[in-house]
């Protein structure tokens, strides 16, 4: 079952066509990464899905509803973590979550959400005294307090230290385990590679690649094989690394040589992203 269906989506601002007829679906319970450089159309697309911006053309269904015609009950099923915070500085972490819980008919327990986002030791600290990364964790908690079915996460780990990022990743994985659907936008390509079941790469308002991260890295960029032979450093690039490694090993065995310093450097999602978004 699809949580999000987009067909032929278009949006222009005057003469600038920000989104140019894109199509994609997000399955229920999936983490979907929407990637692309600034100005690619990500924000416009997400705001249309959230119901905050009207489209010019195309079909959009989110949880079975056109966001432009959505009811308050539909909005309760949507959680949004914005890139910029709008927190109450004089409230504590727990007070903040209780305030936002009051906007929903069936919210999650605020103390449970505090633990979920790793702020247990900060639950009684005022927002203004939190670090930037801790405030982002509170933003994530606010996005989850209504127990939504679909969560939009816009750059969710900006400002996090490495440990906090790993904690946030585990939280997002737990959401998937609970059957929640997540749309993730991020500039951290390792984050998308770790979390997303599928990704779509936007450039100039069109989707230039879509698929599982492992599929995207499977053949679009050549694998690099490095080794030393007779003191000479050798670098080879191939789209069939398994076959080439077999050939190199057979050649070395036949000659009684060692393949010193052998390394196989497979393309990452970042390599694919840079190739696809290059001007």
Where are these regions (language model features)?
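A general boundary/transition motif marking the beginning of the first structured unit of a protein
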Residues: 1, 88, 101-102, 236-237, ...
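Extreme N-terminus of proteins, especially the signal/transit-peptide cleavage junction
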Residues: 1-2, 216
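ABC transporter nucleotide-binding domains
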Residues: 4-6, 11-184, 189-203, 209
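Charged, amphipathic alpha-helical segments
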Residues: 208-216
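Short, charged/small-residue-rich alpha-helical element at the C-terminal edge
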Residues: 215-279
